[in-house]
Structure formats: C-alpha cells, structure tokens
C-alpha cells in the first residue's frame, strides 16, 4: 500500500547532463511506487550544458505529472539554490538531493523516510568510508567554535519534515547553511550511514567557492570573528602601552635623548591604544548592523517550467 503523505523531492542541478536522466528516472520510479502523491522540483543553477534539454526530451518516460524546473537567473551556488527549491515545495516531507549522483539504493531512501515518520524531523544520509581531509578538518573546527558544538558530516541527501522546514525558512539568517540551520531548529535529528553501491562522480565546487562558503559559515555560526577582533585589539593595546612605558623609562634613565622622541612615542602609543580599542568596539557594532540591514534576496528566479509528459 502506498503512503498517504504528500512528499516533495528537491534536487540541485548544475551541468548534470551525464547523470540527470538516470537520477530523474530512478527518483520518479521510487516516489511513484512509494507514495500516492508527490512532486519533483529541479533547481537549475544556470547550467550551461544540455541538462534541461535532456529532461524535456525524455519527459514521456516519467510517471509524475508534477515535475517543476526552477531556473535561476545566474549561478547562485548550492545553498541559495536549494533554498529556492524548498521554499517552493509543499510536501509534508521534503527530500533534499544535493547532487544527481546516485551511490545509494531505494532502501536508503526508505530508511530515512521511516525514521522521519517515526519522530525524527531531520534525517540525513552519509556514505560509509573516510571523509576528505579538508571536510573533516572543517567540520572539526566548526564544532569547536560554533555556538552549539555542531556535529556535522558530509551528507549527500536528507529528508525534512514540514514543521522543521518551516521553522528554518522563517529564520532571518542571510548565510544559509542548511546543515547548521537544521541543527539550530531544535527538532530531533538523526543520521543514517549507508554503504555506497558504486563510485559516483559528484559535482565539485571550485576552491574559491569552498573557501568562501567555509568562511561564511564559520563567521555566521560562531563568534570567532569577534573573538579575533578583541584578541588582536587587546594585544596591540598592550603593545602600545608597553612602548609608552618604555619611552618613559628611556626618558628618565638616559641623560641624552633625541629631541622630540619621547613626545612622539607617547603620542603614538596613546593614539594607537585608543584606535585599537575603538576598532574592537566598532567591529562588534558593525557586525550586528550588517546582519540587520542586509536584506537582499538570497536568490533570483528567471523562470519556472512545469514538465507535462502529455505535451
């Protein structure tokens, strides 16, 4: 018997012409067999290949009559793109696929859905095996400095309940990092480990994208930036005081001192001490102000296409 719950599946697309057809057929087949009602939302992050064309050419192979392609105006990246897709979704549960690469089985999808239906609002799935060194270091560092000691890992897919998704969508965070935001939602979370059935080539971010995302996440979900500012301000303040004290000692102990040296040193010492203290205070207020006033949209949609297999 099919499940009565309405589910949405949101998938990220970017230059996936080699894998999108297999992914879409597999996903559609699974949802058709498992649920009475479902929708598939494909977020096209300004692909430059034939990703969308392949979907349109093979639409008659699909069972669903509710396949939506969300075309973004320019390349936004994974997190803003998935935000666009999840905001459009209407399902009681929402599957999120960060890639069209398939290295899991339907059993994995069943397992995360069953956990979600039995009390866990956010359930992620991650492959068994060693993580990339860079990812491992990033997650360990984020756990150390984040507000809630976030324990994150590389998740390839997840399912989220409607109430958890609504809470996360209501957050005013401009840095949208779903893994952290779901943990901050306060709802029960769980993870499922699966054994990859094959090696799947996953979409790769450029180095600059990864570094930018890592920096945004660390500074958005911790007070590391403020701590660094305060520590540096304090160090330079103490250094300036030390130089001022040294200038006074030199003036009192040496018989001959270069004219104006003491006055200049004291002036620079006091001046820079004040500047560094003020910079530390301003840094705090600027951080707070920027968080409040930056109200730019997280994504821009160019068009929405509804794929109808009967057309």
Describe every region a protein language model picked out.
Residues 44-52, 101-102:
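A conserved acidic beta->alpha catalytic loop
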Residues 107-122:
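Conserved donor-nucleotide/metal-binding helix-loop-beta segment in metal-dependent transferases, i.e.
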Residues 1-29:
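N-proximal low-complexity "stem/linker" segments adjacent to membrane-targeting elements
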Residues 19-21, 49-58:
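Acidic helix N-cap motif at the loop->helix transition within catalytic regions
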Residues 163-224:
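Catalytic donor/gating beta->alpha subdomain of glycosyltransferases that bind UDP-sugars
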Residues 94:
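Short aromatic/hydrophobic "clamp" motif used to bind/position activated sugar donors
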Residues 72-89, 107-111:
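Glycine-rich, basic loop-to-helix element that forms the pyrophosphate-binding segment
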Residues 36-47, 70-71:
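Short beta-strand/loop segment that forms part of the nucleotide-sugar
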């Amino acid at each position: 018997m099919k499940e009565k719950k309405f589910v949405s599946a949101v998938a990220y697309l970017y230059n996936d012409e080699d894998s999108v057809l297999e992914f879409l057929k597999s996903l559609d087949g699974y949802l058709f067999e498992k649920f009475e009602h479902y929708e598939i939302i494909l977020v096209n992050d300004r692909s430059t290949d034939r990703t969308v064309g392949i979907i349109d050419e093979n639409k008659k192979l699909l069972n669903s009559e509710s396949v939506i392609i969300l075309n973004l105006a320019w390349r936004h990246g994974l997190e803003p793109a998935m935000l666009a897709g999840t905001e459009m979704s209407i399902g009681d549960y929402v599957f999120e696929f960060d890639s069209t690469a398939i290295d899991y089985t339907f059993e994995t999808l069943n397992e995360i859905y069953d956990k979600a239906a039995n009390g866990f609002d956010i359930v992620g799935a991650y492959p068994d095996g060693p993580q990339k060194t860079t990812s491992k270091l990033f997650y360990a560092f984020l756990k150390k400095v984040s507000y809630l000691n976030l324990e994150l890992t590389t998740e390839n897919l997840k399912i989220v309940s409607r109430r958890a998704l609504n809470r996360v969508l209501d957050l005013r965070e401009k840095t949208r990092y779903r893994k952290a935001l779901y943990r901050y939602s306060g709802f029960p979370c769980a993870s499922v480990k699966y054994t990859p059935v094959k090696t799947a080539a996953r979409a790769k971010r450029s180095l600059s994208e990864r570094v930018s995302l890592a920096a945004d996440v660390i500074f958005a979900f911790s007070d590391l930036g403020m701590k660094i500012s305060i520590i540096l301000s304090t160090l330079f303040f103490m250094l300036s005081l030390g130089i001022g004290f040294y200038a006074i000692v030199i003036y009192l102990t040496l018989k001959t001192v270069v004219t104006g040296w003491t006055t200049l040193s004291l002036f620079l010492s006091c001046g820079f001490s004040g500047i560094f203290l003020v910079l530390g205070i301003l840094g705090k207020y600027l951080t707070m102000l920027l968080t409040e006033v930056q109200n730019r949209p997280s994504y821009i949609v160019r068009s929405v296409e509804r794929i109808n297999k009967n057309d």
